[in-house]
Amino acid sequence: MIDLRLLRDDPERLRASQRARGEDPGLVDAALAADENRRAAVARFEALRAEQKALGRRIASAPPDEKPALLDRAKELAELVKAAEAARDDADAACREALLAISNLVDDEAPRGGEEDFVVLEEIGTPPTFSFPPRDHLELGERLGAIDVERAAKVSGSRFYYLTGVGALLEFALVDLALRQAVTAGFVPVIPPVLVRPPAMEGTGFLGQAAENVFHLEKDDFYLVGTSEVSLAAYHMGEILDAAQLPRRYVGFSTCFRREAGSHGKDTRGIIRVHQFDKVEMFSFTTVGEAAAEHRRLLEWEKQFLTALEIPFRVIDVATGDLGASAARKFDCEAWIPTQGRYREVTSTSNCTEFQARRLDIRMRDEQGIRPLATLNGTLVAIPRTIVAVLENHQQADGSVVVPRALRDYLGTDVLRPKR
């Protein structure tokens, strides 16, 4: 949620942010109007309540001949106070809804523009050149006995998959490597719930523009998380944290669920875009002043992981028009996919500043009092796309795949060989 003081003091800054995102700046004006209405409703309620209290004192000391008229007024005031209280509550709820509709204030340094206006910050590693026609990840995975989408389609429909044999072992190896790296860096490992209630989903910003990609269990009013960011952010919902103990860093492993609405016809082959996948996610609670530096640290941990897998990748600074509602700035790591001849996103890290913390009522206490804090998230490994990158970049002419050195102890082999 945006800072109400910012809305009142500098609404044009918020309008400019909305325009930079390609979103409606009129939402800012709607929020201003809702705030004015709320303040007027609060003032009317408080004035009537004050009159009611004063009248109560008068009645207590009034002579008998004056009491009937005063009691009539007291009855009238009681009805007015009740109506004013309801109007205040309605105005407060409407103001909150108006504030929730506005996305986070974009970072001044985030590049402006749409999806294709990102800025490449660096390229790490060199895309491989093959002396043979490279196979895509699905063909490699099927030959290795690692990926089965045909049976998954029979069981669950499109955009599902089985990881079998070395495919399943490869997932466990990647998760183990990611968790060991994160724990070494000081993260607390967490296995969070994947079913959450509306306040957690709304608080993290996934019930606005992203709502169409969320699975909702309507009967029980649960949501399936698309990332453990949701569960990890809400872990301290309604709490006040000691600033001296920040940053608090958690690394969560969970299954993630996405409807992929609007993706019809995109990435229909293989496991690049699926409805269900596993992911290791970093999450940090820190001070607002440390948020930008923490963002860079999360990015460095992502780069460290991909470098260990010997995958060529690049880092991009995502343009404002491609940011999620909660992110003020986002960096993506994109791995080279040989058969597509382009880079594809495999990890991302976002600085959400105070936005999620305000919505989730998470604050910190320091010598200056109780204040908002910042939240940040970063993918350490999203399993399907990382497997895609590993298989395609490390393939050999016979369809075998060289195992990255960082995974060999876990897998117990240097090379994954075709079963057919």
Curated annotation (Swiss-Prot):
- Quote the record's binding site residues for ATP: R258, R259, E260, V274, E345, V346, T347, S348
Location in the cell reads: Cytoplasm
- Reaction(s) this enzyme catalyzes, per UniProt: tRNA(Ser) + L-serine + ATP = L-seryl-tRNA(Ser) + AMP + diphosphate + H(+); tRNA(Sec) + L-serine + ATP = L-seryl-tRNA(Sec) + AMP + diphosphate + H(+)
User: Which GO molecular function annotation, any one, does this entry have?
Assistant: ATP binding
Cross-referenced InterPro entries, in alphabetical order?
aa-tRNA-synt_IIb, aa-tRNA-synth_II, aa-tRNA-synth_II/BPL/LPL, Ser-tRNA-ligase_type_1, Ser-tRNA-synth_1_N, SerRS_1_N_sf, SerRS_core, tRNA-bd_arm
Q: Describe the function of this protein.
A: Catalyzes the attachment of serine to tRNA(Ser). Is also able to aminoacylate tRNA(Sec) with serine, to form the misacylated tRNA L-seryl-tRNA(Sec), which will be further converted into selenocysteinyl-tRNA(Sec).
Q: Which organism is it from?
A: Acidothermus cellulolyticus (strain ATCC 43068 / DSM 8971 / 11B)
Name of protein? Serine--tRNA ligase
